């Protein structure tokens, strides 16, 4: 999703590939996969981001996701 990142493509690819492997292992259909990923994002926001920044970060993430699917 992000065009510029402080993380390497290799780091991101390794994590994404692991996450895809888990979803495939469980034969998760698209809707279940999206629910699981949404729950993961919500959990990360509520456990790792100060409450004062959560909504703005969630909005930025949402905008980035929307832009990513528009360009594909």
UniProtKB/Swiss-Prot annotation:
A Pfam family recorded for this sequence: DUF1414
Superkingdom classification of source: Bacteria
Protein name: UPF0352 protein CGSHiEE_07850
Family per record: Belongs to the UPF0352 family.
InterPro entries reported in the protein's UniProt record: UPF0352, YejL_sf
HAMAP family: UPF0352
């Amino acid at each position: 999703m992000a065009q510029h990142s402080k993380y390497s493509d290799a780091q991101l690819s390794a994590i994404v590939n692991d996450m895809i492997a888990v979803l495939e292992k469980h034969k998760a259909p698209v809707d279940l996969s999206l629910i699981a990923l949404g729950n993961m994002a919500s959990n990360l926001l509520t456990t790792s981001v100060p409450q004062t920044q959560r909504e703005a970060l969630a909005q930025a993430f949402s905008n980035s996701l929307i832009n990513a699917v528009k360009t594909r």
